[in-house]
């Protein structure tokens, strides 16, 4: 029985799955939108939201925690200097998943996961 075993295995070993999530979250924060399967998008959403919350915290420990997960220093810098300030007034819900349809080769359900864009302040 699999009671209280949350999360998807995605047909991978634990180390492969964690490495894939790290790579995908790094790409998502770098490009701000990626195309992937529905299941992978739903899984990396929680990790990406946690990284943005670390960025909003902004202290040294949060910076080190984010740097331990995100693979590129430039993306960590972007997270703390560009992405986190954009969401300073938003309490969660930093990403959106849009379903695209099915992939031609294997009919896997594809989705776009992207960072929610904040409306630019209007000048009067």
Swiss-Prot record:
SUPFAM superfamilies: Prokaryotic ribosomal protein L17 (SSF64263). InterPro entries: Ribosomal_bL17 (IPR000456), Ribosomal_bL17_CS (IPR047859), Ribosomal_bL17_sf (IPR036373). One of its GO terms (molecular function) is structural constituent of ribosome. Disulfide bonds: none annotated. The keyword Ribosomal protein applies. Keywords: Ribonucleoprotein, Ribosomal protein. GO terms for cellular component: cytosolic large ribosomal subunit. Coiled coil: none annotated. GO terms for biological process: translation. PANTHER family: LARGE RIBOSOMAL SUBUNIT PROTEIN BL17M, RIBOSOMAL PROTEIN L17. Part of the 50S ribosomal subunit. Contacts protein L32. NCBIfam families: L17. Belongs to the bacterial ribosomal protein bL17 family. This is Large ribosomal subunit protein bL17.
């Amino acid at each position: 029985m699999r009671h209280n075993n949350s999360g998807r295995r995605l047909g991978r070993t634990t180390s492969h799955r964690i490495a894939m999530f790290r790579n995908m979250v790094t790409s998502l924060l770098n490009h701000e939108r990626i195309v992937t399967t529905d299941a992978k998008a739903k899984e990396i959403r929680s990790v990406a939201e946690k990284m943005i919350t670390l960025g909003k915290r902004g202290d040294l420990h949060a910076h080190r925690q984010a740097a331990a997960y995100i693979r590129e220093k430039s993306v960590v810098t972007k997270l703390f200097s560009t992405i986190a300030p954009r969401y300073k007034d938003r309490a969660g819900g930093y990403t959106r998943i849009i379903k695209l349809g099915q992939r031609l080769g294997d009919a896997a359900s594809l989705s776009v996961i992207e960072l929610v864009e904040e409306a630019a302040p209007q000048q009067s």
